[in-house]
Amino acid sequence: MSVSSNCREDIVKWAQERLRADNYAIIYKRQGEDTTQKKIEKPQITPISTNRDARSAFLEEVQNSVVEPLKAEFINFDEDMSRKALAEGVELLYAKNELNDLFELSFTFNLGNDYDPAMSIARGYAALLGSKDLSLEEFKAQMYQLASSMYVSVSNNQTTINISGLQENLEATMALVEGYLRNLVGDDAILRNYKDSFLKGRHNRLFNQQTNFSALTQYALYGGEFIDRVTLSDAEVEALTSEELLERVARLFELEHRVTYYGPASLEAISEVITKHHAMAEEPT
C-alpha cells in the first residue's frame, strides 16, 4: 500500500491504536518578559585595602643581602676525575660523589647505528624479553626492590648500558643486570609484534614534517650512499631473526669499552666490585 492511498481517517486510526496518550512533546514560543525567571542577587563587594608600601623583615633581609658574583668553574680532567685500567681494552673513569649515597654506573661501547643499523632494533627487542632465570616482570620487580634502574641507549656511534641506584645495592644490581643481559631468551611472537610496531612507526614518520626536514638535512650532509648504508629497508628488518638480534647484545661484552662511575665508593673499592661482577673478555675486539 502506497502512502498516497492513505486517507486522513487511516492515519488517525493508526495513531490512536499505536501512539500513547503521553507520547508527545509540546514547544511553546512565547514573547514578552518571563515573570517566572529567578535571579540571584549580587553580593556586596567589599574593597580590599592593600599595603603595597609595607615591607616584611624577610624582604628587608633579602634586599639588603650581598650577592657575590658567580665564578665559572671548569672541569680539570686530570684532577677532578681518575682513570684506571680494569683489563685490556677496558678503562674506568671515576669521580667521587660527595653529596649523597647514590651511584651511576655506565658501560659505553663504540658500536652504534652507523656501524650496525640493526643495533637500535636489537636494543628495543631486548627490552621486551626475559632471561633464562627471570621473566621481564620478575626482573623489573627485583630492580624495583633494589631501588635501582637500568637503561640501554643506542646512538649513531655508541651503545651505553646505564644503571643507577643506592650504593649499598650496587653489587646486587650489577649481578642482576649482567645476568639478565647475558641470558636473554628470544620470543618470535614478541619479535613479530615489535617489527610490526617498528615498521608502522617508520611509515607514520613519513607524514611528519619535522622528521622529513631532519632526513633532508642528513641527506645534504652525508649523501644518499651513507643514508642507504645506515638505514635498513623494510625487507631487511623483516629478515632479522631473534638469534641475530640477541647476538648483537651478547657481543657487546666482547668489545673494548669504557666504564664510568660516579658515586660515594673509593676508586679502589669500586674497581674491585666491577672486576668481580663485570665479565670482561680476555682479548676484546
Tell where the protein language model's regions lie, with residue ranges:
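Extended, domain-scale alpha-helical bundle/helix-rich regions
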Residues: 8-13, 17-24
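M16 family metallopeptidases and their MPP-like homologs
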Residues: 1-5, 25-28, 98-127, 131-183, ...
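A small/polar active-site loop signature that marks catalytic segments
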Residues: 238-243, 248
